[in-house]
Every structure is written in structure tokens, then in C-alpha cells.
Curated annotation (Swiss-Prot):
GO molecular function ontology, one term from the record: nuclease activity
The name this protein goes by in its record: Putative pre-16S rRNA nuclease
Record-stated family: Belongs to the YqgF nuclease family.
Coiled-coil annotated spans: none
Organism field: Thermoanaerobacter sp. (strain X514)
Keywords associated with the record: Cytoplasm, Hydrolase, Nuclease, Ribosome biogenesis
Any single GO BP term: rRNA 5'-end processing
One Pfam entry name: RuvX
One GO cellular component term: cytosol
Annotated compartments: Cytoplasm
Major subcellular location class: cytoplasm
Role according to the record: Could be a nuclease involved in processing of the 5'-end of pre-16S rRNA.
Amino acid sequence: MRIMGLDVGDKTIGIAISDLSGTIAQGLTTIKRSSNKKDFERIKQIINEYEVGMIIVGLPKNLNGTLGPQGQKVVRFVEHLKEAINIPIILWDERLTTVEAERVLIEKADISRAKRKEVIDKLAAVLILQNYLDSQKNK
């Protein structure tokens, strides 16, 4: 079963997908947000195409563990997404994954600022999903 990882932002949704064994996450695409209906249709297409059995959605929390405004937006997004699809969705603590993604792109990939904006959400989705997959291996 493949697992999908989502990094939900105001303007884009980064999407990652696992391999069939649920071991390795890889970046798939970034969706430009338009409306929940259109966003959910695109997510459903990917679910069907890749036979996804579960979704992990990054939940942005403050460093002290509380939910800020962005975290509340993601919770609402997931509530609506659960009405549109019928596979399990897990919210996963994503504190600092976007910061980590940007650091990786700057230090390891030497990518320009403009190019970073294009791939950062997809890489954040990879980090969210890989963190989840790694946590399941250790159980």
C-alpha cells in the first residue's frame, strides 16, 4: 500500500508518495491551490492513480506544541478532505519541516531562491511522510 504525504499551505499543497513497501518517500508534485473542490479532485486523481491507502498531512504546530492559525487551517482542510475521500487521514506534527526543507535546498542542492520556491512544499511533504514512515519502522 502506498501512503501519500501532504504539506498544505495557503497557496500550494506539496505532495509526496511512498514506495509500495512504505519505506521511502519521494516528491511527486505541487498543486497550486484554487478551491477545496478542485484541490480534492486532484488529490483523488492521485489516490486512484497510485492506489494510495492512507494520507499523512503535516500539522504545523508552534514550538510549544500548540496550534496556531495555520495549524487550525490545516485541521479544517482535513475535516473537509475526510468528507470527500474514504481512506484514513493522519495529522502528523510537522514542526520545522519547511525550515529543514529550505536548509537542505540551500546547503545541499545550492538551488536559487526562485527555484527553491517551486520545490520547497514538495520537499516538505517528503520530509513529513519520511518522518512518519521512519516512526512506523521503529514500532
